[in-house]
A protein has these predicted regions:
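Short, surface-exposed loop or secondary-structure junction motifs
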Residues: 1-202
Length: 207
């Protein structure tokens, strides 16, 4: 199945059908498993709406909010707006390789590296078939600010209802039962990590 779908030639709906044959890592309520849930939800949106996830989100979220630079596959005339992606390697900081370049682990297994930005371009090698709900869209700080502003306004933007108030409330609630182990001071909402205790939540920083 793989772990990163944005550059795949296989559609998400096809992948989800294959996922359905796999055993569960845990059943609902047993444990927190960071996995493919958002990708599966994106495939469900496509199945129910009859649209690609990109078309559905553009019609219902991106365009109503005025998010003019948010895409699953960036048009060629805007390709230069993409940031160059770099990866930290044993030889220092290098431009991230393409999908087919891999790093071989000591045990002989191949681990896919960070992706370059080519997989987010319209008419890329993927054929623009895999609309990954979990990590497929790219945007700008300005566009994302419009989305966050809508959440802060309980689902409204300039007087227009984008999401229901209840949907926003559910997004930012911690849905993990207290007995399920997770990061100290944190919980998980609908697609977001939730800080439940500022005094416990923290980070040692990055290297």
């Amino acid at each position: 199945i793989g772990w990163y779908f944005a550059g795949d030639e296989e559609s998400m709906r096809s992948k989800v059908r294959r996922m359905a044959s796999l055993p569960h890592a845990a059943h609902p309520g047993e444990a927190f498993v960071y996995g493919y849930n958002t990708d599966i939800l994106g495939a469900l949106v496509e199945e129910i709406s009859g649209q690609t996830l990109g078309a559905f989100l553009d019609e219902n979220i991106f365009s109503p909010l005025g998010m003019k630079d948010t895409y699953f596959f960036v048009p060629g005339d805007k390709a230069k707006q993409l940031s160059t992606v770099y990866a930290l390697t044993e030889d220092g900081l290098q431009r991230a390789p393409s999908k087919d370049q891999v790093e071989t682990e000591p045990n002989g297994s191949n681990t896919l590296f960070y992706y370059g930005q080519g997989h987010y371009l319209e008419n890329s090698i993927s054929g623009n078939r895999s609309y990954s709900g979990g990590a497929g869209a790219v945007s700008t700080a300005k566009d994302y600010a419009l989305f966050l502003e809508m959440l802060l306004n309980d689902g409204e933007s300039n007087g227009r209802r984008i999401l229901s108030r209840k949907s926003v409330e559910l997004m930012i609630q911690n849905h993990l039962d207290p007995q399920i182990p997770y990061r100290s001071g944190s919980g998980f909402g609908l697609g977001f990590n939730i800080v439940t205790n500022l005094g416990q939540f923290g980070s040692m920083g990055t290297e």
